[in-house]
Structure formats: structure tokens, C-alpha cells
From Swiss-Prot:
Source species of the chain: Maclura pomifera
Gene Ontology molecular function terms on file: carbohydrate binding
Assembly information from the UniProt record: Formed of four alpha chains and four beta chains.
Key words of the record: Lectin
Name used for this protein in its record: Agglutinin beta-3 chain
Residue ranges of the region described as Disordered: 1-20
Chain's role: D-galactose-specific lectin, binds the T-antigen structure Gal-beta1,3-GalNAc.
Source organism superkingdom: Eukaryota
UniProt record similarity statement: Belongs to the jacalin lectin family.
Length: 20
């Protein structure tokens, strides 16, 4: 995604990797 986060759960149309 636009934020380019980096944890374990891949979500969103951009495939952001975020903690969830």
C-alpha cells in the first residue's frame, strides 16, 4: 500500500503488510 508497512498480515488492494 501507499504506506508500505511491514509486519505479517497482507491486506488491502495494495497488499500492505500490517500488524493485525
Amino acid at each position: 500500500g501507499p504506506n508500505g508497512k511491514s509486519q505479517s498480515i497482507i491486506v488491502g488492494p495494495w497488499g500492505d503488510r500490517v500488524t493485525n
